[in-house]
């Protein structure tokens, strides 16, 4: 279906809704336009904390009711327009933390980098521009971006900005789409330096048998410049360079000559 405006977007949502959410729109265009207004969207979210993989908690802002279903439908509609790059392993069919980690087995050096405040950094404007680059027109990009973002407090700018909530069924796909240029540029950088690059959501990993990771190295300076010019910031506290012989970890899995979970790693130690 050629999605040109709110009417054709609503029609597309209506067609996929029985498969994604088990219902059909009742008010159709009215439902979509009403939920696209910030004052209505803000009332249709719930917040709660979940434990992080390492320590502390992560705040989840999850849509409820019809808005959640509409976001699920939007993800299904937009997905065919996005071709997942080889370097992306998060929120991609047939890929996982295991396929991500497998790229970095048996390497002398493994560098882990975390993107700070990943989802809140991806604003309405960035989503809209990325959807237009994907081929959607301004009207459709605007509606999708408003339906899938929520006002969030930006500590750095000291203001509210519409951004992707961590907990929306549409946020994973939309975040990958926004990261298209970042992934392309980092893949090209990695290729120039003979390094392997992969990304799982906000976790970026670089690995190689030779070192390009010395402090203030040209590689690290170029990497930081690409990240910041792409609208993200590196979380310095979570940056880790792991050398061969130490426990090298990628997205929660141990990588040596093969990928192991923590339980498998402990079992291997006991039987060694």
Q: How would you label these PLM feature ranges?
A:
Residues 1-49:
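Non-catalytic, polymerase-adjacent accessory regions of viral genome-replication enzymes
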Residues 46-71, 89-92, 151-175:
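Short, conserved non-catalytic motifs in the polymerase core
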Residues 52-54, 209, 257-258:
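Short acidic-glycine loop/turn motifs at beta-strand connectors
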